């Protein structure tokens, strides 16, 4: 929840149906190049608006207070001077503002318009329905500018928008890394802040995975408290932010032990004898699936939909579709028994690799994924199988049910089966792969491919992106959801996208932050160093100026993005300094110093984020440094330097070169991270360079 939101006393004036005649017939604003002052604005919202519209209005007020340092003084809207902000058609009408017909707007569509009125300006926001008004307020927040302690929007304002995609969802999936990077380490306040960040990007679907698969039943008091927290987060997203929440779960993986770890946030997974896949054809095992579901739905009973992925985690080798349907029917019965009166959540199938397909082993033997799935999949047989799945659901499942298309080829069969309106497209990895070493991703091509493919299917319900480490992936995430709102944004050049993002994060530091993002792939160590010194000064001073619509919501503190950029740029600078030096004639000692410095920066970040745990549990048994043609050339040059004039470089010389730095680095970092992540693959690359 935003830092000062929720304090009603100084925030708003509730519209009470003031006659339009008392509003002195507002006229549309026409003068360009002027400002509409918001520092002392009165915000008006009708008390009959839904809770999420009321909350959005409070959030707007809190943001203005944050910029100006001034509480929104309560004043009657009919007599107040200065700018008045009307939230919703009823509030606008109370100020004499009429929008005309809004029926042409699509779902979540809105109008933001400024009017001139005797005594001050009126800035009105309204949607075709409350959800549109809610998204309109999120958009207004993006338009707000600060000049010192003065808040304003550029005038005139006349925006009429509808989204390209009605459903714009985000899914988090990742690993047990350190706080605040990995979502599994988040607590309730962090989850709510994430929901706020999503709302600020006009995301309207939150696809949440609570990891019921690691909670054995009967639930411990700690596990039950954790699920109660999930329930409250769902409630917050839906009631206070107007989002839909979908809950993810495996169809047949259950927790059988807590692995000796009481806190589910740090409980290991996937670990044999801690979690198991159940065979739905075995009555006893099917009963255990139902017991797990029942305990889950009894607490987390307030979501809009429940999604079962067809595999990974879960699935059963060669299990027929009838077994998947039996699981869905059991889930339907149990969900309906626990859901609030008058509601019927949707059941959704995440079409991943297909129920009963591609597993090598008997699932009772191991919960570690092992699939005969290659870069040639999904092939024609996989797509055909998804068609069979859809037809089976049509014939055997009660409504409402839906689909997530998890692979681009599945969209064709979804269209053929005429269920595009039931389907959200989740091109997993378009924003960020997982598992993947923690790094901010740049580049737009993967996102453009998503919307190129999705654009071929008129009637598709929506699109979804995924994050492994949300706090690192603002560039691509921002680009993805700006494009989901309006696909014309796909044509915006990356430097301009980063400027747009930086304005939403740190408006007073817009150019610095955008340049820092771009520097993550800069080849010039000196140029990176110049930016680093400015970031260090910003971080050390602790004040980046008034936060933007996104920046105000960052956690664990307002400078999180600055700090993450600084640490990643230190890695990049060290890498490029080594590469640049290898193009000259450095001494062996200089080369050793540069390599050790590069590894030290990498390993510091590796430890900061908690990726060292991934190496320790062998999920990531490979290098953590960034490969590339420039590094390959540098390694060959290093091999020549280590020869010290000899016609060739034997292994002994290379091994000896790394010896002292191994000792130094192992004194600071764990052995696996040093040796598996850095030394051994780097050494081998030098040996094999030619």
Regions found by a protein language model. Give the residues of each.
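Positively charged n-region of N-terminal signal peptides that target proteins for export
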Residues: 1-5
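Bacterial N-terminal signal peptides
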Residues: 6-17
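Acidic, contiguous N-terminal accessory segments
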Residues: 21-116, 150-156
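Feature activates predominantly on carbohydrate-active enzymes
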Residues: 56-59, 63, 103-284, 427
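Conserved, mostly hydrophobic/aromatic
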Residues: 64, 129, 198, 308, ...
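Catalytic-core regions of glycoside hydrolase
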Residues: 72, 147-149, 173, 204-206, ...
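Short helix/loop capping segments that flank catalytic or ligand/cofactor-binding pockets
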Residues: 95, 133-136, 180-181, 413, ...
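Catalytic domains of carbohydrate-active enzymes that cleave complex glycans
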Residues: 489-690
């Amino acid at each position: 929840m935003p830092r000062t939101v929720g304090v009603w006393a100084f925030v708003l004036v509730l519209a009470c149906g003031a006659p339009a005649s008392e509003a002195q017939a507002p006229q549309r604003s026409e003068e360009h190049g002027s400002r509409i002052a918001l520092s002392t604005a009165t915000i008006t919202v009708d008390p009959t608006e839904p809770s999420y519209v009321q909350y959005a209005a409070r959030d707007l007020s809190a943001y203005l207070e944050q910029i100006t340092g001034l509480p929104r003084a309560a004043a009657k809207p009919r007599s107040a001077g200065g700018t008045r902000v009307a939230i919703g058609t009823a509030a606008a009408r109370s100020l004499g503002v009429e929008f005309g017909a809004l029926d042409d707007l699509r779902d979540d569509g809105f109008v933001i318009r400024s009017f001139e009125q005797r005594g001050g300006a009126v800035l009105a926001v309204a949607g075709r329905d409350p959800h549109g008004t809610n998204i309109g307020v999120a958009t207004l927040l993006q338009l707000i500018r600060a000049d010192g302690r003065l808040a304003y929007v550029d005038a005139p304002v006349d925006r009429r928008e509808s989204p390209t995609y009605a459903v714009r969802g985000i899914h988090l999936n990742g690993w047990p890394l350190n706080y605040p990077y990995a979502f599994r380490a988040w607590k309730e306040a962090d989850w709510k802040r994430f929901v706020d960040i999503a709302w600020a990007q006009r995301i309207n679907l939150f696809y949440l995975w609570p990891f019921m698969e690691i909670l054995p039943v009967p639930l411990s008091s700690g596990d039950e408290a954790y699920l109660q927290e999930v329930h409250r987060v769902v409630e917050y997203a839906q009631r206070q932010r107007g989002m839909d929440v979908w809950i993810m779960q495996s169809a047949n993986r259950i927790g059988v032990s807590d692995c000796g770890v009481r806190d589910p946030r740090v409980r290991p997974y996937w670990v044999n004898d801690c979690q198991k896949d159940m065979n739905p054809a075995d009555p006893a095992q099917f009963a255990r699936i139902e017991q797990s579901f029942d305990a889950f739905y009894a607490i987390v009973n307030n979501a809009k939909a429940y999604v079962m992925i067809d595999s990974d985690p879960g699935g059963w080798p060669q299990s027929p579709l009838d077994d998947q349907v039996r699981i869905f029917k059991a889930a339907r019965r149990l969900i309906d028994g626990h859901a609030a009166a008058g509601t019927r959540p949707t059941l959704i199938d995440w079409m991943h690799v297909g129920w009963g397909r591609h597993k090598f082993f008997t699932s009772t033997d191991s919960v570690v994924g092992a699939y005969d799935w290659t870069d040639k999949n999904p092939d024609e047989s996989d797509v055909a199988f998804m068609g069979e799945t859809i037809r089976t659901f049509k014939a055997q499942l009660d409504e409402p049910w839906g689909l997530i298309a998890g692979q681009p080829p599945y969209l064709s069969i979804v269209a053929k089966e005429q269920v595009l309106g039931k389907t959200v497209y989740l091109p997993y990895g378009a924003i960020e792969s997982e598992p993947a070493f923690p790094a901010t991703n740049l580049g737009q091509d993967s996102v453009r491919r998503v919307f190129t493919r999705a654009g071929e299917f008129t009637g598709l319900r929506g699109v979804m992106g995924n994050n492994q480490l949300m706090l690192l992936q603002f560039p691509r995430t921002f680009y993805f959801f700006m494009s989901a709102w309006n696909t014309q944004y796909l044509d915006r050049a990356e430097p301009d996208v980063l400027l747009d993002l930086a304005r939403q994060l740190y408006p007073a530091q817009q150019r610095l932050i955008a340049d820092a993002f771009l520097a993550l792939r800069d080849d010039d160590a000196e140029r990176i160093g110049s930016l680093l010194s400015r970031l260090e000064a910003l971080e050390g001073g602790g004040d980046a100026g008034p936060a933007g619509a996104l920046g105000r919501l960052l956690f664990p503190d307002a400078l999180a993005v600055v700090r993450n950029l600084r640490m990643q740029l230190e890695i990049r600078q060290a890498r490029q300094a080594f590469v640049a030096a290898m193009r000259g004639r450095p001494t062996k000692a200089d080369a050793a110093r540069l390599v050790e410095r590069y590894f030290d920066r990498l390993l510091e970040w590796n430890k900061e984020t908690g990726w060292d745990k991934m190496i320790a549990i062998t999920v990531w048994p490979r290098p953590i440094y960034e490969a590339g043609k420039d590094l390959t050339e540098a390694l060959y040059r290093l091999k020549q330097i280590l020869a010290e004039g000899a016609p060739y470089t034997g292994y002994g010389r290379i091994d000896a070169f790394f010896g002292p730095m191994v000792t130094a680095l192992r004194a600071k970092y764990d052995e696996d991270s040093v040796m598996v992540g850095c030394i051994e693959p780097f050494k081998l690359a030098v040996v094999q360079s030619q």
